[in-house]
Regions:
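C-terminal charged capping/lid subdomain of soluble metabolic enzymes
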Residues: 3, 19, 172, 296-371
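ATP/NTP phosphate-donor binding region
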Residues: 1-86, 316
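A glycine/threonine-rich phosphate-anchoring loop and its flanking beta-alpha core
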Residues: 8, 105-202
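Short glycine/serine/threonine-rich phosphate/pyrophosphate-binding segments
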Residues: 17, 40-44, 95-102, 120-124
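Solvent-exposed alpha-helices and their adjacent loops that cap or buttress functional pockets
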Residues: 2-4, 24-26, 80-83, 104, ...
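A short, small-residue-rich loop immediately preceding and capping a beta-strand
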Residues: 80-103, 107-118
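Active-site segments that bind and position negatively charged phosphate/pyrophosphate groups
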Residues: 189-306
Length: 371
């Protein structure tokens, strides 16, 4: 049986929008520009300026709806500006980009992404994380191919809120730990072997360049350390996602994530936690849950040191999650919609998962008390 894999192309730099026409014009002349409100305010003018003097025609800025939901995808699909376009430019953060993936796939249009945050790998992955309109996780949409090209404008990313890069570091540094756990004791074929190997390349750049990248973004300055972190978050982590997930008939596998992301989805049912804390922030605490579940105490101690240095969460209090909410969280983690559940080589009950959360919290409080 044949197997195909679509991988992304990318451009990064303060002037990378100069490359837009080069990589898009072969797909047509009309682009629907869809994204978040703030992202469109920051990027639309720069995109339009880069395409001035070409035959590319941009739509007016189109708000994606504010949530990565199928309802918003349907709303966008019904718009004439979207239906009449040859391609879609997805501008903004993960939820805006993921909504556009569904729209582009359903309408059969080429998709180009313009991340304005260094917070996640959505800009170069085929999958889309979809939610109900109220923000509770619904499912993962598996697209057949990645976006055609990802344009990461360093100046625009540098002007974004620092907490998004901070959260992106917390999210992407999970790749090595999660893919190792998910693939442990498995016999891997070519592509997932590549993916789990590339996952190891996420960790060092984020640990080495993360502190300096945070200094730069707080100062609203572009720089090589910021670029290295953005590349690790958007591209390296994205490549891992593309190479560790397959829904191709006869070639299904999933080694992309495990307990840390299961914790994130679990936390979406806790209103205060979900409302006030980002995806990456919760995944970072989920890494501690993973290590507690795996009883990997030495790794947990080392990650606590990094998390503390980056001000990532170490306790339930840090993420506004209450102990009485844990049974509902564990039930959500074990829901069939959460494909990360069970991506470990041993039996885990909902009670075990809740206990691992409590253990991570306990050890976090002990770590802080020891300082």
């Amino acid at each position: 049986m044949s197997y195909s894999l679509s991988l992304p192309a990318w451009s990064i730099g303060v002037d990378c929008y100069k490359e837009i026409y080069k990589y898009t014009h072969i797909y047509g002349k009309k682009a629907a520009v869809i994204g978040g409100k703030i992202a469109l305010e920051k990027a639309y003018g720069a995109i339009a300026e880069a395409l001035a003097g070409t035959d590319m025609v941009l739509s007016e800025p189109i708000w994606y709806g504010g949530q990565a939901s199928y309802e918003n995808a349907e709303m966008l699909k019904a718009m004439d500006a979207v239906k009449d376009a040859d391609m879609i430019f997805a501008v903004g953060g993960g939820r805006a980009v993921d909504t556009c993936k569904v729209v582009a796939a359903h309408l059969g249009k080429a998709l180009f992404t313009f991340p304005t945050l260094g917070s996640n790998c959505a800009g170069c992955t085929a999958i889309a994380i979809m939610y109900y309109p109220d923000g509770v996780f619904k499912d993962i949409y598996y697209g057949e191919r990645c976006p055609m090209h990802c344009f990461m404008n360093s100046a625009i990313v540098a002007d974004s809120p620092a907490e998004f890069l901070w959260a992106g570091i917390g999210d992407s540094i999970a790749k090595e730990y999660e893919s190792e756990l998910a693939a442990r004791e498995k016999k891997l074929s070519h592509v997932p072997t590549m993916g789990t190997t590339i996952a190891k390349a996420c960790t060092a750049p984020l640990m080495n360049y993360g502190p300096k990248a945070m200094e730069l973004i707080r100062a609203k300055q572009a720089g090589p350390e910021l670029d290295e972190c953005v590349l690790a978050i958007v591209i390296t982590a994205g490549l891992v996602s593309n190479m560790t997930i397959s829904t191709d008939g006869g070639k299904e596998f999933f080694f992309n994530s495990s307990a840390a992301h299961a914790f994130y989805y679990a936390a979406t049912v806790a209103p205060e936690c979900a409302e006030h804390h980002t995806h990456g922030e919760l995944v970072a605490f989920g890494i501690l849950v993973l290590m507690a579940l795996d009883k990997n105490w030495e790794a947990l101690k080392e990650f606590q040191k990094f998390a503390y240095s980056m001000k990532l969460p170490l306790t339930l209090k840090d993420i506004d999650l209450k102990e009485e909410e844990l049974p509902a969280c564990a039930a959500k983690a074990a829901d069939p919609s959460v494909v990360e559940w069970g991506r470990w080589p041993y039996e885990v009950t909902q009670e075990d998962f809740a206990q691992a959360i409590l253990e991570a919290d306990k050890r976090g409080r002990e770590f802080l008390a020891s300082l």
